[in-house]
């Protein structure tokens, strides 16, 4: 019995280390505040607390093409660490998705959370008039959420929130 107890006590640090959140490895990039991790492969956006524990997970749509964004029009979502540098009320904004339907009103849902992606001023996290696209690769490069989810996310974040977009698998 003493041997079993000793073994359990010896393994306790290893077991507790394995129980850490999968997001703790990003804490050094998060600046001690809640942050966002976007998994393009899993079609998820996770809001994470300053200790690395998930607060809330949302379904997303990301760019049609795989890999990191390199040039305008490549239909790829950027990869890396960014910050939200603008919280734009997007009601009434239009966009032509070049699908033959012409300009779509409220194309970005209620909010557009602009990211500071070098060389690209028009990449962000936003809502959608196409909720059926969530869980698919359907965007020109942005991260798309259901409108109710972008409203919820916007209420939980602030200007300067760190956004980590994980790379596509190679």
Residue ranges and their predicted role:
Residues 42-44, 81, 112, 122:
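Structural motif
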Residues 21-31, 74, 90-170:
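Exported/periplasmic cell-wall-interacting domains
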Residues 82-83, 163:
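Generic structural signal for buried aliphatic residues
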Residues 1-4:
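Positively charged n-region of N-terminal signal peptides that target proteins for export
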